[in-house]
A protein has these predicted regions:
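An N-terminal assembly and electron-transfer interface module characteristic of large anaerobic redox
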Residues: 1-309
Length: 309
């Protein structure tokens, strides 16, 4: 047994949890959105109420992961509804399962890990509801090192890590041109070209969704984190096969609280490019959001049972 996929509704119980502990394999619980595919696509909620608790929350008690919307209702020739996998999502789910299985056999020294942290602009501290983010992140990196992950160049202390983050992994205000110029000289950012960005966007975003990005932010690279030759800078701190990245602002404006906790506008190119670089440029095997929260869970529309972008 390499993985378990459960398409039922609710918990399987403590006996199943004991079984999972013995076999030590990932347990997936893909979602049935319980309505016509078109209605689910147009619904801003995705899933709520009893279906949310029974399809997402209770399976997670058993250890289920990846609540991926996979099944929907369709109308047959007899005008009766039937359940089937959504064709454009089935391949993604299968690839996800195979990726998890592959990680079990890949040496830790070869695994590539991306860790996002939330941080305010400039010299603001990394935040997570009172948690000591810097020391906690450093302890995680030490544990990864002990487990055989490649963290070459990791500083000797948490203070050294924080200095590296302030130098290479900062978040800038829109008008902090002097700080940005210094960052470009000394911060060792990843640079995303228009060709790469366009290629990654085509793989990831639906054309109509990307047009919302362009309408809100202009054409790539936009006005923020852009270089004179038309590239987009991605702040990152890399130690071997582990990269730390700040979560960029999910919108524009001076109200940082509103930008983080809810904006209806499409995110800027910087926000999208960072995640696309992590996936396609850095080729991360694992992505972690470290801390209590950032802006990801406050982005517009569906929060669970997400549709394709």
């Amino acid at each position: 047994v390499s993985a378990i996929i459960n398409m039922a509704h609710g918990r399987l119980g403590d006996a199943f949890v004991d079984y999972l502990k013995r076999v030590n394999v990932p347990f997936f619980a893909p979602l049935n959105v319980n309505r016509l595919e078109k209605k689910w696509e147009s619904d801003n909620m995705g899933m709520n109420g009893g279906f949310l608790s029974q399809s997402v929350v209770t399976p997670e008690i058993d250890g289920a992961l990846r609540p991926f919307a996979l099944f929907a209702h369709y109308v047959g020739k007899d005008d009766l509804e039937y359940v089937a996998a959504m064709p454009e999502r089935l391949g993604t789910f299968v690839q996800t399962v195979n990726n998890y299985i592959g990680l079990k056999h890949k040496p830790n020294s070869q695994k590539r890990v991306a860790i996002y942290y939330y941080k305010g602009p400039g010299q603001n501290a990394m935040t997570a509801g009172g948690m000591e983010v810097g020391p906690s992140l450093y302890n995680l990196l030490l544990r990864l090192k002990q487990e055989g992950y490649n963290v070459a160049g990791l500083p000797d202390s948490a203070e050294g890590l924080m200095q590296a983050i302030q130098r290479q992994g900062a978040v800038f205000n829109l008008y902090a041109k002097g700080a940005f110029d210094d960052f470009m000289k000394n911060g060792k950012p990843a640079l995303v070209s228009k060709n790469d960005y366009d290629s990654w966007v085509k793989k990831t975003l639906r054309p109509e969704k990307y047009q919302e990005v362009v309408k809100a932010n202009g054409e790539f690279p936009g006005e923020f984190m852009a270089t004179p030759d038309g590239k987009l800078a991605v702040a990152r701190v890399q130690f071997g096969n582990v990269v730390l990245l700040p979560q960029n602002a999910a919108g524009k404006g001076d109200n940082a609280f509103q930008i983080v906790h809810g904006t209806d506008a499409a995110p800027p190119h910087t926000y999208i490019a960072s995640y696309l670089w992590t996936q396609y440029g850095f080729k991360a095997d694992v992505l972690i959001h470290f801390g209590t929260h950032g802006s990801l869970e406050f982005t517009p529309k569906k929060q669970v049972a997400l549709s394709n972008l």
